[in-house]
Amino acid sequence: MKTLYFIEVTDTFGGEANYSWVTRHVIKAKSLKGAVNALSRRSGISWRSDGFRYLSKSGATCAFIEEFDPEFHSDFRFDTDDRL
């Protein structure tokens, strides 16, 4: 069974998430790794785990991935939405 994942991708400044721009996505995948792979295919960016977030190879962007919670995440506008 596939799970929905909420993903935020943003820029970094000084190694920290900056949020001067952000894209939000809902991706359906079988696992967290599957969600990262789907994000990589769609964004064209390779990601590596840095504990609780994922960093791009350049370190200029980061992604936060968690399970989608309709009560909390439904108010956002999504750039990618696999719920349909």
Where are the language model's segments positioned?
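N-terminal cationic leader/targeting segments used for protein routing and processing
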Residues: 3, 29-31, 58
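Short aromatic-glycine-(Arg/Gly/Cys) micro-motifs in beta-strand/loop hairpins
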Residues: 1-22
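Short, mixed-charge low-complexity intrinsically disordered segments
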Residues: 45-84
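Short amphipathic, charge-patterned alpha-helical segments
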Residues: 35-40
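A short, exposed loop/beta-hairpin motif centered on an aromatic-Gly-Thr core
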Residues: 18-33
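Generic structural motif
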Residues: 10-12, 30-32, 71
